[in-house]
């Protein structure tokens, strides 16, 4: 039978972050009504709150505080668990770590503190934050875990919020730093400072250790119960302190994200290779665009798109609703959910088959989520505000999301591997390391070995100066002063596919990496600079109130008042290098062209990938609209190909005239559409099994059987 999470893929969660200052709050919550709604929604694994960010509990706790709405009806939530368990559903218990407003105010010594010693409510936050380094708070968490495991019968536990919402300087953090490192905790962000880098590493280690502590508390009491930790900040800036250690503390991983369907596509691939066990879980709200809009609901097409993007990656879907403060729900939400889940259920027998197939591996470094050139600001600065991957506030995010975008639109099979699974590097036909400032020695050694043994590598920008020295014999020498630079092809080089020339070079709004020394191999492009160093911000005609910088000087020189066009003189600074190393091939770019969302840059990056692939065929391909994504799984003599139409609109228009193919050295016995198992006409030619889909709206799945 396997673990419950391998079989129960239709999940939901009802947010219950409700205070109790109003006597009506949560009084109308009825477990029978909600259970019926779950049945209507065709859910087979509900996640159920027993406590919330408020810190208030939904059971008669002895060590915490029960919500006043449950006084006199203390067993309501237990009754809901019992109803679901008796029906054959698998139940996941929700508990909030760190975000505990009730205990925050009860225990000032538990509070997270900023660099000035102020708690988080100083700035008006509703959320009270307790520090995981405080041993009294940990003891409280352990006691609560013991209580809820004794009181409720559940199949899994979901721990929310194991991350640093702020950089904490409480007494507990200061004491731990003093013990493990010594001296004052750093307060200024400086990626050139070894102590700051140590501090950054400690944030990750401390949070990973806290997550493992919570997991261990569950496992030593009920080892059969699964544990999952919120993993959303793995997509966010450095300050959240989440890396692969959170994944290792989880039986499987997942989270809720709100960056749109392209971010979800990337996250599904990243989590596929990050999770300890399949399937991963993808969560998102039914509210549009986020839970902040309490009474809005995404269109059926948007909800369906989210569910089927997850299913295309053989993941488990979880849709989030939010309870009304008095404890009621909108039953119409569950009717909509049910229609989608009844449709998705038909595909579930196929989701347990095979492994994801891809030729290109994008390397996502969970320790590289910083802007290494942005230094000298306080940890309490607004620069540390909610910076998320979809907002592209750090170089590695912009580059890797751009690479994913380009490969997806060119229907090139790609996956996302990570620094926690260096063993996956050797499986790549082509490895891409996009503008990663966080690579450590073990990863560099694994990449070197991979290339030496015949691997193909593309890396760019900030990535691994030591590899630049190893592969090309040149030394990294910082970045250009100019923050808008160009690359021009060298004589005889077609690296830019004719899209850009020496006179009209390729533009990137970034500082270019500089090197010293004579490079090994070929120089395919060189750096071209603008006529002058651009001002910190280009102030467009109507943008008088933009961020201030040094005032205008009449003698200021520029090439154009609206832009920073290239000068007529190119430099001899290498822009793109190519060399053989051992049995492998390496291409390096001084600028992360993969991160630029522009058709020419996308085409050029795809061309570089094709050049590195050489004669080896891709696992699949398509003649299809940019909005069509293909995902392939292989299980022995069967290949399962999913197509997703990524139009992120309220109402999706069908994709038309789509031709897709999978590579094979033999003709198939049959090609069938799923889940109806109807035969599909195909052609087998030139090592490809081709099918044609006249039109489809959002999702199709096909089985190629050999």
Named regions from a protein language model:
Residues 39-75, 99-124, 152, 166-177, ...:
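Aromatic-lined carbohydrate-binding/catalytic grooves of carbohydrate-active enzymes
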Residues 93, 97-152, 161, 177, ...:
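Active-site-adjacent "subsite" loops/lids of carbohydrate-active enzymes
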Residues 647-667:
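Surface-exposed beta-strand/loop patches in extracellular or lumenal glycoproteins
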Residues 437-516, 609-610:
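A glycine-rich, often tryptophan-bearing local segment used as a flexible ligand/cofactor-contacting loop or short
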Residues 49, 155-160, 189-193, 197-201, ...:
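Hydrophobic targeting/anchoring helices
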Residues 1-56, 87-89:
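N-terminal structural segment of carbohydrate-active enzymes
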Residues 14-29, 59-75, 123-142, 192-209, ...:
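The substrate-binding groove and active-site-proximal loops of carbohydrate-active enzymes
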Residues 30-31, 36, 48, 392-471, ...:
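Helical hinge/lid and interdomain linker segments adjacent to catalytic or ligand-binding clefts
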